[in-house]
Curated annotation (Swiss-Prot):
Cited HAMAP family: His_ammonia_lyase
Organism in which the protein naturally occurs: Koribacter versatilis (strain Ellin345)
Superkingdom, natural source: Bacteria
Lineage: Bacteria, Pseudomonadati, Acidobacteriota, Terriglobia, Terriglobales
Post-translational modification: Contains an active site 4-methylidene-imidazol-5-one (MIO), which is formed autocatalytically by cyclization and dehydration of residues Ala-Ser-Gly.
Family: Belongs to the PAL/histidase family.
Pfam families: Lyase_aromatic
Subcellular location: Cytoplasm
EC number: 4.3.1.3
Keyword Cell division recorded: no
Protein name: Histidine ammonia-lyase
Gene3D superfamilies per record: Fumarase/aspartase (Central domain), Fumarase/aspartase (N-terminal domain)
Keyword Cytoplasm assigned: yes
Amino acid sequence: MKALHLTGNTLTLDEVREVVYEQRPVLLDSDARAAVDRARAVIEDVVANDRLAYAVTTGVGKLSDVRIPPAENRTLQLNLMRSHAVGVGDPLSEQVSRAMMLLRANSLCKGWSGVRGLVIDTLCEMLNRGVHPVIPSQGSVGASGDLAPLAHQGLVLIGEGEAFYQGKRVSGAEALRAAGIKPITLEAKETISLINGTQAMLAVGLLAVLDAEILAETADAVGALALDVLQGTDAAFDERIHKARPHSGQIQVAANLRRLLAGSQIHESHKDCARVQDAYSLRCMPQVHGAVRDTIHYCRSVFEVEMNSAVDNPLVFPEPKKVGERSDAPVHGDIISGGNFHGEPVAFALDFLAIALSALAGISERRIERLVNPALSEGLPAFLAPGAGLNSGFMMPQVTAAALVSENKVLSHPASVDSITTSGNKEDFVSMGMTAALKLQRIVQNTRNVMAIEALAAAQALDFKAPLKTTKLLQKVHAAVRAVSPQITEDRILTADFAAAEALIRSGKLAAAARN
């Protein structure tokens, strides 16, 4: 695969996916390197002349009033990296670790952070050679960015900390040595540029968006199958209804449901029944699924801005290069302290996405209830069980779905409405974005499991509808489910079926089955 040139300005979510999951190689773009070098020259000029600049010739946080002499700058870099690596808890996945390295490297490529190109090159080489820092998941309050997670990432660059390499958890020094990467000695400002930013919460958020897009598409396919076997109507998806309330997600879902439900023998068998409208979990799929799609789109837009932003502090703004300027001329510029590390924009989006996916799981669970409840299932066997009574069928899977949905409700409480004071009251309002990200991870997994149960239940219900057939597209959905989970003809342990259906959804294959 062709190497991705990082510029700091053009990274896309699809490129993140390619680097994280498909190991696309990355490197620092040559034009970006020139900008990086120019900003670095400003830092070196400040250090050489011992001028006052936050985090360059001073301590950080509450200790920003302490001057650091140039002779002690390397010690400061090492101390900052070690002292900020205070994470606890289970490590983030290797995929999140890869995303964090990519995002940090891309942000530094903008040329407003003041690091050497060598720092970015080393991050890129770690990505390319599969050195993935072990990053504890807890310990960030989301301002000044994700300090602890990013410090654990930075430790590996200097040959410390731990890394996953070729399936093993080893020391950072051992991982670099095995991969043929030389550890670096950090110079002035480079530690703060590596650890001050939103890349941990953002990495989790970006991967969650990729998962959420698959879930949203899968929800339409599984929901359509549930509606058909429950003898629902597609009248509520009439294009005129949705043009009257033209939210883009709603219009998109309604059109998708019309496409999925066209040509069903099951529908034809009850078209003259007396029921004029369905329950909300069936009738309002465009409004609910559509709102989820709109939320995903909004969160994606926030994250795409963030991943092409400079988010450390202070930022370095070199003077424009003059015509005829000598290559060895000193470069001057402004070093300005600000707050781009603050995770609030990302935290809000993470919380919003959590709420949306919680709703998607909730409506899925309500359809499961209709499939298994003989008072609601339009003639299907109780709990979709062959020989109900002797067999319990889907009685307990609905309970599992209910448990997951209820957990999601608790996890959907916004983390970003909370704050706590840190660093001697210097950092007195924080985003809690990493907490939002970790909750979102759990909600994504719970939602996928709920949808897996709905897919299994809807497939089981369709089996009972034979010889009547659903639409050709929904037959493909059914076939995809049956390829990983056979029909339940008597009670069996369903744990493996749940896992297989969850993996089918996660891979995107179930959504793909319904496309054409």
